[in-house]
A protein has these predicted regions:
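Short, surface-exposed connector motifs at secondary-structure boundaries
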Residues: 17-19, 42-46, 67-72, 90-96
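Hydrophobic faces of well-ordered beta-strands that scaffold small-molecule active sites
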Residues: 21-26, 46-48, 74-78, 97-99
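Glycine-rich, proline-tolerant flexible connector loops at the mouths of alpha/beta enzymes
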Residues: 34-62
Length: 103
C-alpha cells in the first residue's frame, strides 16, 4: 500500500501564487524549539541559514524535522557552492536551496 507524502509547496510555487507581498523569517538558531515556533507563526516561508552559522548536516536535518508538521515552505542556504555538499543537502530532503557565491 503506498504511503501518501505531502510536501510543502516549493518557494517558486509560493511566489507564483502570491497575491500580496510575502513575509518570511530566517532561522539562525540551532534550536529545534525556536525553529518550530517560527514555522508555526504563519510566515509564508522560512530560511534556515547554513552559511552564517556553525550548522552541520545533523543540525539542518533536525531543524527540517522540527518544522515538518507546519507545512511552511523552507529554504535552506548552504554554506558554500560545492556540488558534493549540495547533493547531501538534497539527500536530507531540502526542496529549496539558496546557494551563495555563484559567479
Amino acid at each position: 500500500m503506498p504511503i501518501p507524502v505531502k510536501l510543502p509547496p516549493t518557494f517558486a510555487d509560493v511566489l507564483e501564487k502570491a497575491e500580496q507581498p510575502l513575509v518570511g523569517a530566517w532561522i539562525c538558531s540551532g534550536s529545534e524549539a525556536a525553529a518550530e515556533i517560527i514555522a508555526s507563526a504563519g510566515f509564508s516561508w522560512t530560511l534556515i541559514d547554513g552559511e552564517h552559522s556553525p550548522y552541520g548536516l545533523e543540525t539542518i536535518l533536525s531543524l527540517l524535522r522540527a518544522t515538518d508538521a507546519y507545512g511552511v515552505t523552507r529554504v535552506v542556504r548552504v554554506p558554500v557552492n560545492n556540488t558534493a555538499l549540495i547533493k547531501q543537502y538534497l539527500d536530507l530532503g531540502v526542496q529549496n536551496l539558496m546557494v551563495p557565491m555563484i559567479d
